[in-house]
Design a protein with these regions (language model features):
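Acidic, proline/glycine-rich low-complexity IDRs
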Residues: 2-72, 93-97, 103-240
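Amphipathic N-proximal alpha-helical interface segments
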Residues: 84-85, 90-98
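A sequence-level detector for low-complexity, Ser/Thr- and acidic-rich stretches
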Residues: 78-79
Length: 240
């Protein structure tokens, strides 16, 4: 075996150890942060069989997990893996994966039930669909760096009926600032964005469609002034 071959193997093992260290530190730092916000379960929400093996989008390290954070009056569900460092051999950049994680904070008390039941809840389904969209999107972080506040639409999700328009469409405002959750989090390679998700009423969705970026910003400001912020209240009046 030549010296170059030995050096190549040594370098590969070193890179693998470094990748493992950064992955573990990333997971730990995210959990430590969420523990400052509320009580984090010891277990995570994940799949028995990873969807990426069945045609689903690949997450940076392959981990597709979610966590629950219980606060006094609300519960947060958050993605946990979109900001893992890339593990594939061809990905050599020292980045924190997609550079962001999503979360939804809700006042639905049923979210405090057994963790095994959470995957059947509409809030988890909403977070899951958003996370899969981000995993599949090549430059979602760049969009948030440019616009701060974005919106997205879904169909065929079993959210409370007053958030669904006559065509079965559901609007979500992304990036409304929280008074308690930081907008960013420092991880080993770089800081990532923590992106909130807030369900919109049909009137609010129509306003965003008509007004575009300005409408999204104005609606986010209205939520701030109303002190509902980023939180999805299961029962609330439309602000438009």
């Amino acid at each position: 075996m030549g010296y170059l071959s030995l050096f190549s193997k040594w370098k590969q093992k070193k890179q693998e150890k470094e990748a493992e260290r950064v992955l573990e530190e990333s997971i730990s730092k995210r959990k430590d942060y969420w523990n400052t916000i509320g009580h984090v379960d010891g277990d995570v929400l994940t799949h028995l069989l990873n969807p990426m093996f069945f045609g689903g989008p690949a997450w940076p390290s392959g981990r597709q997990t979610f966590i629950r954070v219980q606060k006094t009056e609300t519960v947060i569900l958050a993605s946990d893996g979109l900001s893992d460092p890339f593990q594939s051999p061809e990905e050599k950049s020292r980045t924190q994966g997609k550079g962001l994680e999503f979360y939804i904070e809700c006042d639905d008390e049923s979210l405090r039930g057994p963790l095994s039941d959470i995957q059947d809840h509409w809030a988890f389904d909403l977070l899951y669909q958003m996370s899969q969209n981000a995993a599949a999107h090549p430059n979602m972080l760049e969009l948030f760096m440019k616009h701060d506040i974005l919106s997205i639409e879904f169909t065929d999700l079993d959210v409370p009926s007053h958030f669904v328009n006559e065509n079965g469409e559901i609007g979500v405002l992304l990036g409304v600032q929280s008074p308690s959750v930081s907008a960013s989090l420092s991880l080993p390679y770089e800081s990532i964005k923590l992106i909130s998700m807030k369900l919109l009423t049909p009137n609010e969705l129509e306003y965003v469609r008509e007004q575009g970026a300005q409408g999204r910003r104005q609606l986010a400001e209205t939520f701030q002034l109303s002190k509902s912020y980023h939180i999805t209240m299961t029962k609330r009046e439309s602000l438009i």
